[in-house]
Amino acid sequence: MSDKIAIGIDLGTTFSCVGVWQNGKVEIIANDQGNRTTPSYVSFTETEHLIGDAAKYQAAINPTNTIFDAKRLIGRDFNDQSVQSDMKYWPFKVINVGNKPYFEVSYQNESKQYSPEQISSMILSKMKQTASAYIGKEVTDAVITVPAYFNDSQRQATKDAGRIAGLNVLRIINEPTAAAFAYGLDKNQDKEMNVLIFDMGGGTHDVTLLSLEDGLFQVRATSGNTKLGGEDFDNRLVTWCVEDFKRKYKTDLNQSAKALRRLRTACERAKRALSSSTQTTIEVDSLFEGIDYNVTLTRAKFEELCSDLFRAGLEPVEKVLLDSKLDKSQVHEIVLVGGSSRIPKVRQLLSNFFNGKKLNETVNPDEAVAYGAAIQAAILVGQTDEKLQNIVLVDVTPLSLGLETAGGIMTNIIDRNTTIPCKKSRVFTTYSDNQTVVTIQIFEGERKFTKDNNNLGTFNLEGIPPAQRGVPQIEVTFDLDANGILNVTAADKSTNKSKNITITNNRGRFSEDQIERMIREAKEFEEADNKKKAAVDSKNELENYTHSVKQAVTDPSNSNNIEESSRSQIESKCAEIMKFVDENPNEDQGTYDLRRKELEDLWNPIAVTLYAQKNNQSNQTSTESTGPTVEEVD
């Protein structure tokens, strides 16, 4: 059995989760706060950067420097329509750096800029630390999940984030596929079962239809919307409340980032409450300019505000049924994944779509993706547990891959939902007479024109013998591996001249030097965190030691054994140190250690004397009580 350990990480828009395969099962690992999911938040202050729960606590008091939703920006251009529409809801600043979105924050009183990959790497680093602390040694091998409908840019950017975090990313896998592992691991299914995974999370929505039989997980079709999730429902509630506040108090909340952040937190809480009750109150004390705000929100009103978004959640369901050529009656199980799948209206619409079919709630919606990623990680590092032996995953490519032909037309070579790995070829010809060079432009997407799709790369095949248009035969081959890496070859059949390119989507990605710089910065963050922790530990030890010395020196039982001048000097030193700690909470470890030594130099000689005196008293008492233990009987 392999003794290598690898972890599975669900890098979520709003929450992240990590799991590991141990002792024949998946363990979902709790963080240092005891929570099994960690907020995907990073906060920057004058003294430190915080990740997870501690960062989310900062959101209300430090909104402009507390970053969330990095997943909605990763791998996207600044001018992307979804980036521009999301920006108006964020209290933090997003700037344009080479048509890439960057977060601008104040950290240690300096203006700093961080890419979505860097913020994501900090969250991944937190998950890595959480797992390493639980396992008892550093873990670097990991499987990271992404939405099934993430394009190549977003997948590669996520992989870069993992590398910056110091992880060896074994594989990037689709979230609903991972959730299918969580559902199907213990199912001894000898008859084929069609399972639909409905995954609606905080920022993205995926639907995958797969068949499950004897440990074979065969993805039939996948679809989704990378701009639909719980955050969008929160946005609708925030907009509604802002308008309500303006109507009631003639004041625009959009003036205050802090007020909007507090309102968003209250709206998110109300949304969750409406999953179990039909009415709740959005209430925020002193929201803006001293005004206490409260409004009643019914489930019916919430459903009305988000009705178009809820209906949009069914579009990928229709698409996967169409692509897989299955009727809805042929779907045996509908498995719910992601926090937003708890919303009653979402469940009702989904059940009604399948003619009232009961939905499967056997997996934990918040943990299923990390659970499945941990299974895949264990398989990839060669864990030979019997339960893992027969599991085989056959996945598909979520987007069509092709090239541009005359008129800017997208001509597919590999259609979406084609099983991977795969290899496909098509023959093309020249467009002009005596054309000696052919430009191969590679795209992914479903639109008819390449300008509306995602450009993956370009190369030229030269040295084609001059001939009339339509005569040369150029064979173009697309070879897509299990990791989704595409190799494209173009060959002139008459001369056997060929050229190829491996698509790693360098367009818009970081250079090797940039990634190395980010890795160094991540290590600097880690070193700073370690120094900060050491300083906090030293400060706590100084406080505890000072309290114990003060307690000892003022103990009535020691009053006869300590000279008044010494007692006064030590009490004064204790008061001085406690005042210093209160006024200087952010000093380095060495400073706190030095203050402790000052107190030790005063107290230790007295402590030694006290110990010796008490020891002598104990010995005397013991001697005095020693005597005959029997009495002579006459």
UniProtKB/Swiss-Prot annotation:
Taxonomic lineage from the root: Viruses, Varidnaviria, Bamfordvirae, Nucleocytoviricota, Megaviricetes
GO MF entries: ATP binding; ATP-dependent protein folding chaperone
Gene that produces this protein: HSP70
Naturally occurring in which organism (per UniProt): Acanthamoeba polyphaga mimivirus
Biased composition annotated in UniProt, kind: Polar residues: 612-628
Keyword set, alphabetical order: ATP-binding, Chaperone, Nucleotide-binding
Protein function: In cooperation with other chaperones, Hsp70s stabilize preexistent proteins against aggregation and mediate the folding of newly translated polypeptides.
Protein name per UniProt: Heat shock 70 kDa protein homolog
PANTHER family assigned: HEAT SHOCK PROTEIN 70KDA (PTHR19375)
Domain of life from the UniProt record: Viruses
Coiled coil: none
Family: Belongs to the heat shock protein 70 family.
Keyword Chaperone: yes
Disordered, as annotated region: 611-634
Family matches, as Pfam families: HSP70 (PF00012)
UniProt-listed NCBIfam families: PRK00290.1
